[in-house]
């Protein structure tokens, strides 16, 4: 593997201007070169048991020089910790068993442990924390619902409502606290009519039957009154209906045989 890396590096350097200087040596490392747009990108990889401190890549530019400060491969150091939007009480490489402390900038809250230790396998434990903004992301909008509120800074409150035909399940108001909304978001569920009891259904049927009977009585009474006002007796009405019935039958027979 080392031979392959060296051969690759020799080929890349010879492919460019012959005046290119050799990459500066870094103890306990392997150098890998890669040609990119008439330049050589060099990367230092530390051998097992060592850890890189500094910038791992160099670029050979037209000035014929390697344009970066050399890194180091040091024994027993953990990777340089990174804490965006925060501070670490360490200004250099941390040895095995060394501890560091973390603190977030104003407006941010620490998520994770406020300390970590460098282990023998060059890892950090507990894992490195992050600094999360105390402000919140826009809250979720429930299906068939919406919220009112335009600011999502820490301490802000939004209020939830549902569309017509739906009711809110959960807390109507949620508050932004240290980058998170609490309590949990509510949901909007369809309003279901409660099932009617057997007694209520029987009562409604009885009322409907009574109304129909009442309407029938009123219609009969009106019909009889109209007969009397027209001077027509029930016998005359019956005779007239029989004649119309006979005529209707004869018309049907004539149409059938024609």
From Swiss-Prot:
It holds the Pfam family Sushi. Keywords: Complement pathway, Disulfide bond, Glycoprotein, Immunity, Innate immunity, Repeat, Secreted, Signal, Sushi. Glycans are attached at residues 27, 67, 89, 95, 114, 218. It is found in: Secreted. Residues 18-75, 76-133, 134-190 form the Sushi domain. One of its GO terms (biological process) is positive regulation of protein catabolic process. Disulfide bonds join 46-73, 78-118, 104-131, 136-176, 162-188. PROSITE patterns: SUSHI. It comes from the Eukaryota. GO terms for cellular component: extracellular space. Its main location: secreted. CDD domains: CCP. Controls the classical pathway of complement activation. It binds as a cofactor to C3b/C4b inactivator (C3bINA), which then hydrolyzes the complement fragment C4b. It also accelerates the degradation of the C4bC2a complex (C3 convertase) by dissociating the complement fragment C2a. It also interacts with anticoagulant protein S and with serum amyloid P component. Disulfide-linked complex of alpha and beta chains. PANTHER family: PROTEIN CBR-CLEC-78 (PTHR45656:SF4). This is C4b-binding protein beta chain. It comes from Rattus norvegicus (Rat).
